[in-house]
């Protein structure tokens, strides 16, 4: 039986694959916790991480999405939610860039993770949706994935409406970075990866460090951080080799 999630390494490139195509790559909380561990480990040992799903769809979210679940006390609900918040943290705190590759549908948690990738390349047939309100779920867990990625009006529309959007609209909303013909998706990702492989590793890591922090700073603080990081990294001898 195939593993539901897989991590492979080729040189210093790590690929994390959601590998349940027969169920739209839905995962249980236990396997989402495993994905978190994979990102933490892969981030320490690579220059970049490619995140993708097997089959026709990127990811349709959590295994139990839309199904009846036992009524839990608030503290137990909070403890259960930590699995997803820890997963979000692994994306945000990774020391290397994460490239998301989205084909087909990205729904619920799948849509949140597509947004959390540093760069998200989507095929033109990709579709994105947060359906939680249609299932009588108040979706602040999903919403929190977007607060540093997606403008307020766009995020509010997706959460309140539960409507599916296409790849071009996801691009304007800030969920996707680029949209390419679906048949060219692998080629577009390979081209980007080859470019990043040629960059000095200190530059790859420094760009992620800056992106992780700068957008939460004041303009002056972000400028000061850029000034320091630029001087520190570009004067390093390893940038020339």
Identify what each model region corresponds to:
Residues 30-34, 83, 90, 188, ...:
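Charged catalytic carboxylate motif
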Residues 51, 84, 143, 152-155, ...:
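A general structural signal for well-ordered alpha-helical segments in protein cores
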Residues 44-45, 53-87, 106, 218:
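Glycine- (often His-adjacent) and acidic-residue-rich active-site loop
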Residues 36-40, 88, 111:
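Short hydrophobic/charged patches on amphipathic alpha-helices used for structural packing
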Residues 1-54:
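Conserved CoA-thioester-binding segment of acyl-CoA-metabolizing enzymes
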Residues 2-5, 89-201:
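Crotonase-fold acyl-CoA enzyme core
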Residues 1-14, 42, 58, 162-168, ...:
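C-terminal alpha-helix plus adjacent terminal tail
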């Amino acid at each position: 039986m195939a593993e539901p999630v897989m991590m492979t390494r080729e040189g210093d490139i790590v690929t994390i694959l959601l590998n349940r195509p027969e169920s739209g790559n839905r995962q249980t909380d236990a396997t989402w916790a495993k994905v978190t561990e994979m990102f933490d480990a892969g981030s320490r040992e690579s220059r970049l991480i490619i995140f993708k799903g097997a089959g026709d769809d990127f990811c349709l979210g959590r295994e139990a999405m839309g199904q009846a679940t036992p009524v839990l006390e608030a503290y137990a609900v909070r403890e259960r939610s930590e699995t997803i918040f820890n997963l979000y943290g692994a994306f945000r705190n990774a020391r290397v860039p994460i490239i998301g590759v989205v084909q087909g549908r990205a729904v619920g948690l799948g849509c949140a993770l597509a947004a959390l990738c540093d760069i998200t390349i989507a095929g033109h047939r990709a579709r994105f949706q947060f359906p939680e309100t249609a299932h009588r779920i108040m979706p602040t867990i999903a919403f929190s994935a977007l607060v540093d990625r997606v403008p307020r009006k766009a995020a509010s529309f997706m959460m309140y409406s539960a409507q599916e959007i296409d790849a071009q609209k996801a691009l304007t909303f800030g969920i996707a970075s680029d949209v390419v013909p679906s048949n060219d998706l692998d080629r577009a990702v390979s081209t980007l990866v080859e470019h990043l492989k040629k960059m000095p590793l200190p530059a790859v890591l420094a760009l992620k460090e800056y992106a992780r922090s700068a957008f939460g700073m004041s303009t002056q603080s972000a400028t000061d951080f850029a000034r320091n990081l630029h001087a520190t990294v570009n004067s390093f001898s390893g940038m020339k080799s």
